[in-house]
Amino acid sequence: SVGFKAGVKDYRLTYYTPEYQTKNTDILAAFRVTPQPGVPAEEAGAAVAAESSTGTWTTVWTDGLTSLDRYKGRCYDIEPVPGEDNQFIAYVAYPLDLFEEGSVTNMFTSIVGNVFGFKALRALRLEDLRIPTAYIKTFQGPPHGIQVERDKLNKYGRPLLGCTIKPKLGLSAKNYGRAVYECLRGGLDFTKDDENVNSQPFMRWRDRFVFCAEAIYKAQAETGEIKGHYLNATAGTCEEMIKRAVFARELGVPIVMHDYLTGGFTANTTLAHYCRDNGLLLHIHRAMHAVIDRQKNHGMHFRVLAKALRMSGGDHIHAGTVVGKLEGEREITLGFVDLLRDDFIEKDRSRGIYFTQDWVSMPGVLPVASGGIHVWHMPALTDIFGDDAVLQFGGGTLGHPWGNAPGAVANRVALEACVQARNEGRDLAREGNEVIREACKWSP
């Protein structure tokens, strides 16, 4: 008979194109692919490219109505993973036309929306994305960025200090405000709502906002420094989230906060636009990230979530601590910390950076080191992160035997000592403990 036979077809015939020269408008992706036994690498790589772009499992007559060559994703390179016999990195190029402008949501729906459940693969992990400059320019990015934030806060030449208020659930609004005041008065720049503090029966959001604003103004008056508290605006609906941000703006506080993964990219981008229009800084917490990024061979690496956040918008984002972890992890973490802060980042596989990324002057995001850190980590943190970071000590402040304010003083004294030692040319990695011991004399 005339015509074609429909049937399950080999993807590699159409979607594996090793001779393809990538365009600088393409979105490039590096996938770590673990195929099912018996599935050749080229077929698995091509399947990923097809399923995340134009492909379907058979030939359909409407294929004739469009130009596949213009719209298809292409697997253009495959390389083995050293030390893993059943894994390889598949590089896929997507034409820019496949994506809606200014929508991180659509970018992820396209690239990772469907393909992760694909039968021919045992596991799939998105390791990195190269976002072309043409696509970046369709995003507003962070509401303000590192430089504007320093100008707003009038704080230069050192990392900023924060503290998450604990116990995170159960305090009344008034007592919560007291804890905020003590920390800010003692010398911290910021205090923080915990990521799961939204608006619960024991403390409704509006009461918390009011008492925290009072604490901020009182601490500012006493210290002569600009203070902030990350008021968590995360809510069940976008409307409610914006309502909370509006109230924060009416109180005149400098910064609000959002959980960008649980809240979702659409909500996050909405809030980021509101924050830029209204002069609010935006602190981003990455609650739920480990669900996506913890498995080594499946999911998405955090550097992809970090890039997505810079596009969607946020002025701070939690990025791990590095201290006390393995050396290799330090390089990888510093890799995505630079992806958040710098304007141009060279490809560097030793730091997990698969592609050179140019952010074309999109504002940078301050990485936040938080979780299990305390005063003795200060030299290492100052050494590793440099000035452009927020160091957050929760228990490391509130756990001080004399209380919150002395705990805050201790952190500030330690930080100032480390910055001064570094500026005087001392080696913090080697002499850190000594620097802290000297500083102890001036600290509660």
Curated annotation (Swiss-Prot):
The GO annotation for biological process reads: photorespiration; reductive pentose-phosphate cycle
GO MF annotation, one: ribulose-bisphosphate carboxylase activity
**One Gene Ontology cellular component:** chloroplast
Binding annotation for substrate: 114, 164, 168, 286, 318, 370
Q: Kindly state which reaction or reactions the protein catalyses.
A: 2 (2R)-3-phosphoglycerate + 2 H(+) = D-ribulose 1,5-bisphosphate + CO2 + H2O; D-ribulose 1,5-bisphosphate + O2 = 2-phosphoglycolate + (2R)-3-phosphoglycerate + 2 H(+)
Q: Which residues carry this modification: N6,N6,N6-trimethyllysine?
A: 5
- Explain how, and how many, cofactor molecules are bound: Binds 1 Mg(2+) ion per subunit.
**Record PTM:** The disulfide bond which can form in the large chain dimeric partners within the hexadecamer appears to be associated with oxidative stress and protein turnover.
Cofactors (names): Mg(2+)
Residue numbers binding Mg(2+): 192, 194-195
Record's subunit section: Heterohexadecamer of 8 large chains and 8 small chains; disulfide-linked. The disulfide link is formed within the large subunit homodimers.
The record's PANTHER family line, in alphabetical order, gives:
RIBULOSE BISPHOSPHATE CARBOXYLASE (PTHR42704), RIBULOSE BISPHOSPHATE CARBOXYLASE LARGE CHAIN (PTHR42704:SF15)
Protein name according to UniProt = Ribulose bisphosphate carboxylase large chain
Task: Look up and give the organism this protein is from.
Answer: Ephedra sinica
